[in-house]
Amino acid sequence: MNLSTSISHLKFNSCLCNASGPKCSLLNELQNLDNSDSCAVITKTTTFEKREGNPEPRYYDNLLGSINSMGLPNQGHNYYIKYSEKIKKPYIISMTGFSLDELITVLTNIIISKTNFNKKIDGIEINLSCPNIIDKGQIAYDFESLDNYLKEICFIYSNLLEKFDEKPILGIKLPPYFEIHHFETVGEIISKYPIDFITCINSIGNALLIDIKNESAVIKPKGGMGGLGGSYVKPTGLSNVRNFYLQFKKRNRDIKIIGCGGIETGKDAFEYILCGADLLQIGTQFYKEDVSSFKRILKELTEVMKYKNYNNIEQFKGKLKTI
C-alpha cells in the first residue's frame, strides 16, 4: 500500500503530519514528531521575537473538538532556524508577522539561512489566518491585503532563491471561507503567484463554548472567544479543500492542498483526499492522543483503501462524485 505523496520536488513517505499548533514549539516536541509516524515536522507558527501568547486558560477540548486562543506562543524565528539540523524528516517552518515588514524580515532570514548557511529548511508555511491575536484581523479575509502580501512574499522568495536548485516549498495557511465568490476571488489571487501549496483550514474564529456548570466561558482570552477545531469543523474543512481543488483545476494550476480540520480517523483522512487533498495535518487529535495518532490513522486509512481496492492515494484523490 502506497501512502506517499509530494509537493513540488519535496517527497513525503506518507500523507499525514502534524498541524502547526499543539506540541511543536520546543525542540523536544519537534524531535518527538521526528521520531513518530508523522511524515514531516511542522513548527509552531513563529514570529520575529519570542512570544508568551495569551493568558491561560486558553485551550479546552471535549468529545467534539477544541477551542483555543493561544495567541501564537513561540520561541522566535531564530530558534526554529537554529534547530533545523536536528530534524531528519522534511522540516517546514510555519511563520507569520504582525505587519508586512515583520513578515518579510522573518521570511528573508529563513531563506538566507538556507541559501547562505545551508540550513535544513524544506518548506515555509506562511500563516495569514490566525484568529486569536487580540486586536489583529486575519489578512486572508482582506482580499486586497492578501494580494499585496503575496506579491511581496513571492518577490522576495523568487529573488533570493533565483539561483537555488531545490527551493523550500512555499505555501500559505488559509482561514475557512464560506461564500462561493470568496473561493473564486481567493483562488484567482493565489493562482497568480508561484505558490506550491495551501493549507486549509485554520480554526474557525470567534467561536464560543460554555461551561454550563459554572455558567462561564471555558477559555479566558477575548471574552472566551477562540478558534474552533476538531470534529466541529470537518464539514467546513472538506468544503474548503473541495472548492479550492476545483478552483485550481479550472485554472490549470498545480497548487497542492494540505487538508486540515477534524481528522480523527482513517475514514476522515480518506474523505479529505477524496475531496482533493494531497497531504493531511492533524491538530486537535494530535493534542489529545499524541504521536500514536499518526500510526493509528494511517493504519485505518490503509484499511479503508484495501476495502475499496485502492493501492495508492492518486487513484481516488479529488474524485468525489456529485449526485
Language-model-derived ranges and their functions:
Residues 18, 41, 80, 93, ...:
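Conserved, mostly hydrophobic/aromatic
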Residues 10-17, 88-92, 159-178, 246-260:
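Short beta-strand/loop segments at the ligand-binding rim of alpha/beta enzyme cores
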Residues 231-254, 264-323:
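Alpha/beta catalytic cores of nucleotide-metabolism and tRNA/nucleoside-modifying enzymes
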Residues 65, 133-141, 191-255:
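Glycine/Thr-rich beta-alpha phosphate-binding loop at enzyme active sites
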Residues 1-91, 95-101, 297:
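N-terminal capping/small domains of soluble enzymes
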Residues 27-33, 103-111, 178-192, 246-250, ...:
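Catalytic cores of alpha/beta
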